[in-house]
Amino acid sequence: MVSSRPRRRKRASATQLYQTCKAAGTCPPDVVNKVEQTTVADQILKWGSMGVFFGGLGIGSGSGSGGRAGYVPLSTGSRAIPPKSLAPDVIARPPVVVDTVAPTDPSIVSLIEESSIIQSGAPSPVIPTEGGFSITSSGTDVPAILDISSTNTVHVTSTTHHNPIFTDPSVVQPIPPVEASGRIIVSHSSITTGAAEEIPMDTFVVHSDPLSSTPVPGVSARPKVGLYSKALQQVEIVDPTFMSTPQRLITYDNPVFDNIEDTLHFEQPSIHNAPDPAFMDIITLHRPALTSRRGVVRFSRVGQRGTMYTRRGTRIGGRVHFFKDISPIASSEEIELHPLVASPNNSDLFDVYADIDDIDENILYSTIDNNTPTSTYSLYPGNSTRIANTSIPLATIPDTFLTSGPDIVFPSVPAGTPYLPVSPSIPAISVLIRGTDYYLNPAYYFRKRRKRILAY
C-alpha cells in the first residue's frame, strides 16, 4: 500500500530568507543575527581577540588541528638527530651546486646543456696542394697507329622450325649458334636455360558431396511480411488501375515516369482531394508484394498517410494495407486410381518373356469359367521374374482359349469343313480354281450380238 503522506518541502536557508525579507523589514531576529554575525558567541570572540593573540595555533571557530605543525608539548624540548655514517667502501658524491634564479631572470630555463659537435662518418678527402705525378717513357718514336680497314658486313641467319607433332614439349631445344658479327633471327616457341624445375600443382576440385552422413538441407527462413497486424488498416481496392498505375488514384497531376515496382513518394498540399477517397493523405506507397490469402492470389501495397503536422513540420499518420485479389487458387482435382496389388497366389503369375517349351500344355488349353464375369489367368514358371497380374473384365461369351501375350505362339487347331445348306435359295455358279487364276465355264459365256446398222 502506497502512503498518501504529502512530501516535505525543503525550507529556505537563512541567507535566502535574509535576501528576500531585509528590504521589507520582516526578517526574524535569529536570521538577522546569524547573517550579520551579531550573536552572543560572535561578540565574545570579537572582544576576546582584542587582548589575546593566539597566532597560528588554529584556536578559533575552525577545526582544532593545532596549526600547520600540530600540537607540541610545552615542557619537552627538541631532540637532536645524529648524522648517518657512511660505509667505509662508499665514496660520497660531490655536492650539487644549485643555481639561484633572480627575480629579473627569465621564467623559461633551458635544460639542454651545450655539447661539442661530434662529426660522424668518413673523413673528408684531402686535396693535395702540390702538382701531380709525371709519366716518363723510354721511347721517343711516334706512337703506332693501327689501320683497321672496313670489311663487308656478313649477315648470319639461323632458323629453327618447331614441329609439335614430332617434338616432345618437355625437351629443351638447343640454342642456335651465335656469331661474333651479323644479325641472328631465332624462331622458336620457348627457350629454357639450365635444368628444368618441376613445380607441384594442386588440383582445385569443388566437392558437392555432403560433409555428414545425414545432411540437413539449410533452408533460409523467408522474411515474414506483417500485412495483417492490428497496426495496419485493411482497405480492399477494386479498381484495376491500382496494379498498373497507382499514382493516378492518389494525385491528378501527371508526374514524371516512375518505376511502379519501387516505393512511390508524393508531395501533396495541405488541402487536396485524391481521385479515390481510399487514398486520401497518402504520402508514401511502398513496393508491391504478391501473397496468398484464403485461397486467392493477392496484390498488396503498404501506404503511409500524412494526416497531421508537428511543430517541426513533420507529417505523421497511420499505415494502410491496400490489397486487390487477382484470381482464386483452384483446388486440385482428385483422380480415382486403381491400386496395383499383386496376387497372393504365386501360381497366377507369368513371365511373358519365358521360353514356350518350358510351359505345361495343360495350362495353355485351360478354359475360362463362363459364370465368372471378371477372371485373372496367367502363367508362372519357377525361374522367371515375379510380375504383377492384370484384371480384365470379360463378358459372358462361349469358351475361349487364353492368349497370354503377343510374343507367345500357340499351336492352332484346324477348323472343320464349313456347313453348306442342302437346298440353296439361289442357283450356284460353278467356278474352276486353278492356281492363282480362274476362268468361267465356257457354257456361261454370252454370245456376241451383231450390232445392226439402220439406214435412214
From Swiss-Prot:
Keywords: Capsid protein, Cytoplasmic inwards viral transport, Disulfide bond, DNA-binding, Host endosome, Host Golgi apparatus, Host nucleus, Host-virus interaction, Late protein, Microtubular inwards viral transport, Phosphoprotein, Viral penetration into host nucleus, Virion, Virus entry into host cell. Disulfide bonds join 21-27. One of its GO terms (molecular function) is structural molecule activity. It comes from the Viruses. One of its GO terms (cellular component) is viral capsid. It is found in: Virion; Host nucleus; Host early endosome; Host Golgi apparatus. A motif (Nuclear localization signal) lies at residues 1-12, 446-454. Highly phosphorylated. GO terms for biological process: microtubule-dependent intracellular transport of viral material towards nucleus; symbiont entry into host cell; viral penetration into host nucleus. Minor protein of the capsid that localizes along the inner surface of the virion, within the central cavities beneath the L1 pentamers. Plays a role in capsid stabilization through interaction with the major capsid protein L1. Once the virion enters the host cell, L2 escorts the genomic DNA into the nucleus by promoting escape from the endosomal compartments and traffic through the host Golgi network. Belongs to the papillomaviridae L2 protein family. HAMAP family: PPV_L2. Interacts with major capsid protein L1. Interacts with E2; this interaction inhibits E2 transcriptional activity but not the DNA replication function E2. Interacts with host GADD45GIP1. Interacts with host HSPA8; this interaction is required for L2 nuclear translocation. Interacts with host importins KPNB2 and KPNB3. Forms a complex with importin alpha2-beta1 heterodimers via interaction with the importin alpha2 adapter. Interacts with host DYNLT1; this interaction is essential for virus intracellular transport during entry. This is Minor capsid protein L2. The gene is L2.
